[in-house]
Amino acid sequence: MKFYQDENFENIDFTTRHELAEFDNCSFSNCNFGKMNLTGYNFLECDFTTCDLSLATLTDTSFNQAIFKDCKLLGLRFDACNDFLFAVNFINCQLNFSSFFQRKMKNTNFKDCKLISVDFTEANLENSNFENTTLTDAIFDRTNLSKCNFTTAQNFHIHPEQNQIKAAHFAKDNLSGLLLSYGLKIS
């Protein structure tokens, strides 16, 4: 396995590289990993800015303290990633059609993101932040949302009896997302 530490990668198309690698404290700017097989890759304390990882294979991929900013992350199976020390944060990213099924990811930031049709079934998102995030058709089923911040989140549908929402924060203007399951008409 190739090892990279404290390196900056800019404007690189990684889809043309086929070597298994570990990246420690590296930054990636405007790089392409789209549709790439990242099975077994390790990303430790790495930053991704304006990168495309859409439809990449993430089987046993390690993301430890990874930060994604302005990235395109469509259709990713984060549920297939290595569980050990998994920790990610997202700022202004598109994560549509991705899956976090059964993923343990307390204290995760989803700031200014699009999470359309994302699967959070049975995930532990305790104390996570969904600031200014669009959650149209996102699936919350038996999800731990305790202490999460939804005050500026939009278009979510969370069934209070099927999810843990104790001490979660909601704005009075977006409470309708908690009541849709009951068939109420809110004006």
Please give the residue ranges for each predicted region.
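Tandem repeat scaffolds
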Residues: M1-S187
